[in-house]
Regions:
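N-terminal "arm"/small-domain region of PLP-dependent enzymes with the aminotransferase-like
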Residues: 1-66, 84, 278, 284
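Alpha-helical subdomain
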Residues: 212-226, 274-281
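A short helix->loop->beta-strand "cap" motif at the edges of active sites that frequently abuts
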Residues: 200-203, 233
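Short beta-strand segments
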Residues: 32, 175, 239
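Conserved core of the PLP fold type I
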Residues: 54-55, 61-199, 212-214, 223, ...
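Conserved core segment of the aminotransferase class I/II
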Residues: 77, 230-301
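Walker B catalytic acidic pair
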Residues: 209
Length: 301
């Protein structure tokens, strides 16, 4: 059977990690994979994470399954962190996923189940893994103008003109903050216009929230996300805890859906959980319990 296969292309970002490790020059700088490092080139474990882990080990009583949606305390804490009291929670559902990538995967599967072969619009450029995840989910990928290499800013007028021409069967993937890979971010005023455009056209906003807190702080970085989800009846958010909690190898993320009303939220969540059950079945708990412990404790937070 396997003789029909050809070698798949390697991941360019991960390949850079190997090249960096093999480079003997002392002045080298790693601009590859998005991992926080200190001045010594080490990705440290946060003190709050260590304290949370100690508490978990001391108080843990079971290793039984969590359920398809994952750690409920984690889910509630993440919704408080990301959305605050912005929305009526009866419209919101959340499911734990293995990292931000896992969140993107299950949510794109959900989109394709709702609108088979839908078009998802991504920024030019975007995180390299967005496209294969979308394509492997059955979606059609197109790009909207974004980065201006000369000014190192956003081609906002062109971006907005493209968004204004979309319709209710289109999905728009937005970087909630800290645009990867360009670092060129929308201003609050530009986010206001994007939100108004999405509300007008009915296109579905899909927000990748991988770096919350790494730009101008938690509240400032959440502005665009909150503005958009407050303006539209439906939205999706892929949250990652890898960066802001330093839990890269724990693979902890969350898939958040916002529906028109509670009844539609229940239906949509049932489909999301069905997708999860047919893929990784249930998520691991350790990273989720770390984040829950930190967010529920004022001292650790």
């Amino acid at each position: 059977m396997f003789e029909t296969l050809t070698k798949a292309p390697g991941d360019k970002i991960l390949a850079l990690m190997g090249e960096y490790a093999a480079d003997p020059r002392p002045t080298k700088i790693d601009l590859g994979v998005g991992v926080y490092k200190d001045e010594a080139g080490v990705t440290p474990i946060m003190s709050a994470v260590k304290k949370a882990e100690q508490r978990i080990l001391a108080q843990g009583k079971t290793k039984t399954y969590l359920g398809i949606a994952g750690n409920k305390g984690f889910g509630a804490a993440v919704l408080d962190l990301v959305l605050g009291d912005t929305l009526d929670r009866s419209r919101v559902r959340i499911a734990q996923a293995p990292g931000g990538t896992g969140s993107l995967w299950v949510l794109m599967q959900l989109v394709n189940r709702a609108r088979p072969g839908a078009t998802i619009w991504v920024s030019d450029p975007t995180w390299p893994n967005h496209n294969p995840i979308a394509e492997n989910s059955g979606l059609v990928v197109k790009t909207y103008p974004y980065f201006d290499a000369e000014t190192r800013g956003v081609r906002f007028e062109e971006m907005l003109a493209t968004l204004d021409g979309l319709g209710k069967d289109d999905v728009v993937l937005l970087h909630g903050c800290c645009h990867n890979p360009t670092g060129a971010n929308l201003t609050n005023a530009q986010w206001d216009q994007v939100a108004a455009s999405l509300a007008k056209t009915g296109a579905l906003p899909f927000i990748d929230l991988a770096y919350l807190g790494f730009g101008d702080g938690l509240a400032a970085d959440a502005y665009g996300t909150l503005k958009v989800v407050s303006a539209v009846p439906e939205a999706l958010i892929a949250f990652s805890g890898s960066k802001n909690f330093g839990l890269y190898r724990e693979r902890i993320g969350a898939a958040i859906l916002i529906a028109r009303d509670a009844a539609q939220a229940d239906i949509t969540q049932s489909q999301l959980l069905n997708i999860i059950r047919g893929s990784y079945s249930q998520p691991p708990d350790h990273g989720a319990e770390i984040i829950r412990t930190i967010l529920e404790d004022a001292e650790l937070r």
